[in-house]
Amino acid sequence: MKRYVVGISGASGIVLAVTLVSELARLGHHIDVIISPSAQKTLYYELDTKSFLSTIPQNFHNQIVLHHISSIESSVSSGSNTIDATIIVPCSVATVAAISCGLADNLLRRVADVALKEKRPLILVPREAPLSAIHLENLLKLAQNGAVILPPMPIWYFKPQTAEDIANDIVGKILAILQLDSPLIKRWENPR
């Protein structure tokens, strides 16, 4: 069993976080979840609920720990604890900017800062379009420091039919980067 931190910032696309946390739990992993206040609002706007756990099958709840964004004393904030990877999905450009400047003023930003300084996997799923030169510079800076930048782009050659298909494909890409085995991971095969 591995331990993952999933940070959820206020960008649109919270279904990606729900899908990721559900699949990591289904695969038997421990997940520490940090939800920003803006993400709480997005959760309500996009999924009609104020409770993140209500979006996750109940049999997985014992594998998930919710951390308050101001709980800077949380165990996940320390580099002395083993976290296998940190994923921020969706990741707002405000969060990208803060992380790229080393601003660790809340738990979400702190865990990203720790991942970078400890050279642990950090996957950012920025949900913004179009991107300004400032956004691109911040993303470049993070990529140069070891973060994986994974924009949530649909994988059209798999011919998604629903929003759920698109979310599953994007989460499959995250899981592939984490080198996990999941039915959500699709591999291209040459057509015959």
From Swiss-Prot:
It catalyses: dimethylallyl phosphate + FMNH2 = prenylated FMNH2 + phosphate. Its EC number is 2.5.1.129. Dimethylallyl phosphate binds at Y157, K173. GO terms for molecular function: carboxy-lyase activity; flavin prenyltransferase activity. Signal peptide: none annotated. FMN binds at G10, A11, S12, S36, S92, V93, A94, T95, R127. Keywords: Flavoprotein, FMN, Prenyltransferase, Transferase. SUPFAM superfamilies: Homo-oligomeric flavin-containing Cys decarboxylases, HFCD. InterPro entries: Flavin_trans-like, Flavoprotein, UbiX-like. PANTHER family: FLAVIN PRENYLTRANSFERASE (PTHR43374), FLAVIN PRENYLTRANSFERASE PAD1, MITOCHONDRIAL (PTHR43374:SF1). Belongs to the UbiX/PAD1 family. Flavin prenyltransferase that catalyzes the synthesis of the prenylated FMN cofactor (prenyl-FMN) for 4-hydroxy-3-polyprenylbenzoic acid decarboxylase UbiD. The prenyltransferase is metal-independent and links a dimethylallyl moiety from dimethylallyl monophosphate (DMAP) to the flavin N5 and C6 atoms of FMN. This is Flavin prenyltransferase UbiX. The gene is ubiX.
